[in-house]
């Protein structure tokens, strides 16, 4: 539980320190994550008595892979997107997205924040990280049935930069595109499958284009999300207002986790209502997928260790945090 220790700013202070901020995300206007960050903004506006005002741009300003750089350069004051849209820019945070068997968004969100707070990677020093969150267990969603590993051979799968390695390891062909392109890619037959949590089936309407969701709990991955602010804009805020930002952001971390898990449940019901199937791989089949995916983890460790970073320690830490959060 987060207990408020920062009183709302006085009306006089609000008049004196009025600040307008642009917030950009790749999510669509009606997506649950968009609605949640808009509530975040309203809460900050309320607690600062209007000293801060937000203008939101959901899915209509910057693409997901442009948002981080947009925050750094000041094209947007605040942005929410995923680390995996920017190749090799976030070698430390990349450890979060490895196929390590996340059971829920609650666990994944706890892990990513604890991991960040432990390492404070320099790769994020050019922004102010307000908070992080992560979706529920990622799985494969396909147009054709997939019951065994061999069914993936030659299949074109919409992937992020990070999940493209998993796609290759399983014998399929990655097509690296942001989430917003997935519906049309599936509709046009350019890809036969995509990665994502169950949420994408309803939140992005992908249940209209796929027939099967394949769940292997041993390689359930997540995608790490950042909410980052331009450093110059952050430093221009008064200490009191910065305190409000940090307090509200801390309160919103579990809200995102709950929203992700609830949207997974709703999407499960939705896709089944359309006649789609959820294929749960048995332990023997799932073990084969896990063995095939292991090189993704091994290659990450080798690549990042070469740059002088303790990648094996990162992976070990993530595994420990998953186990701890899942208890």
Predicted segments, located by residue:
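N-terminal secretory/targeting leader peptides
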Residues: 12-106, 122-327
